[in-house]
Amino acid sequence: MLKKILLLALLPAIAFAEELPAPVKAIEKQGITIIKTFDAPGGMKGYLGKYQDMGVTIYLTPDGKHAISGYMYNEKGENLSNTLIEKEIYAPAGREMWQRMEQSHWLLDGKKDAPVIVYVFADPFCPYCKQFWQQARPWVDSGKVQLRTLLVGVIKPESPATAAAILASKDPAKTWQQYEASGGKLKLNVPANVSTEQMKVLSDNEKLMDDLGANVTPAIYYMSKENTLQQAVGLPDQKTLNIIMGNK
């Protein structure tokens, strides 16, 4: 699951337009940012907000004199508040991050019309990235999954130049596939100095990776069947791998 703290940080700081009832305003003063209202069960009015690294819900009693901050459960034991927070805060922010990855500089591995899309941030010197690349072969080669790799240079001092060599090649996507297939032994024309163009690509990818809350590679992102952004950092186990590749 994607780190919630990060997605909350992506939300725009928009001032709530309505005048808040006194009990809600008192809670707001504790550092909560009110985002929107919603209709709550039992004749109560709900307020959706964020506090530090958490989404929060506040419930105003029908008389308007009391407010309760916390989770609301129904008779089945279902957390109604958490469902709302996921839908209204985390899911939209996750889709925004997905769009940012779509618009980034990635290398295609697989068929461009493969139904399952998986983004992976990878460093040329990352051994787990190479293992993940090998793990993904059955799904990629069968046309079920397309990997979209965003190269970064974070593991070794030589990482940026090596990544730049791949990006500067005639066919970067093909070169990356050959490089991973060779276990990193493919001979590259590594530049003494990384060009401004290639450095910008690497810097942009690293910034995006950081914004997503990942600090190791491979950092893997995919959408769940509920259309929410999911994260797997490091080499996934078999169960997680199946989920990533669409074998829900």
From Swiss-Prot:
Effect of C129S: No loss of chaperone activity
Gene3D superfamilies the record matches: Disulphide bond isomerase, DsbC/G, N-terminal, Glutaredoxin
A single GO cellular-component term on record: outer membrane-bounded periplasmic space
GO molecular function: protein disulfide isomerase activity; protein homodimerization activity
KW Membrane (keyword) present: no
Record carries keyword Cell cycle: no
Consequence the record notes for mutating C129A: Partial loss of redox activity. Traps the protein in complex with ErfK, YbiS and YnhG
Signal sequence interval, chain numbering: 1-17
Annotated InterPro entries: DiS-bond_Isoase_DsbC/G (IPR033954), DiS-bond_isomerase_DsbC/G_N (IPR018950), DiS-bond_isomerase_DsbC/G_N_sf (IPR009094), Thiol:disulfide_interchange (IPR051470), Thioredoxin-like_fold (IPR012336), Thioredoxin-like_sf (IPR036249)
PANTHER family reported in the protein's UniProt record: THIOL:DISULFIDE INTERCHANGE PROTEIN DSBC-RELATED, THIOL:DISULFIDE INTERCHANGE PROTEIN DSBG
Known partners and oligomeric status: Homodimer. Interacts with ErfK, YbiS and YnhG.
NCBIfam families: PRK11657.1
Record-stated family: Belongs to the thioredoxin family. DsbC subfamily.
Free-text function comment from the UniProt entry: Involved in disulfide bond formation. DsbG and DsbC are part of a periplasmic reducing system that controls the level of cysteine sulfenylation, and provides reducing equivalents to rescue oxidatively damaged secreted proteins such as ErfK, YbiS and YnhG. Probably also functions as a disulfide isomerase with a narrower substrate specificity than DsbC. DsbG is maintained in a reduced state by DsbD. Displays chaperone activity in both redox states in vitro.
Protein name: Thiol:disulfide interchange protein DsbG
Organism: Escherichia coli (strain K12)
Lineage, uppermost ranks: Bacteria, Pseudomonadati, Pseudomonadota, Gammaproteobacteria, Enterobacterales
Gene: dsbG
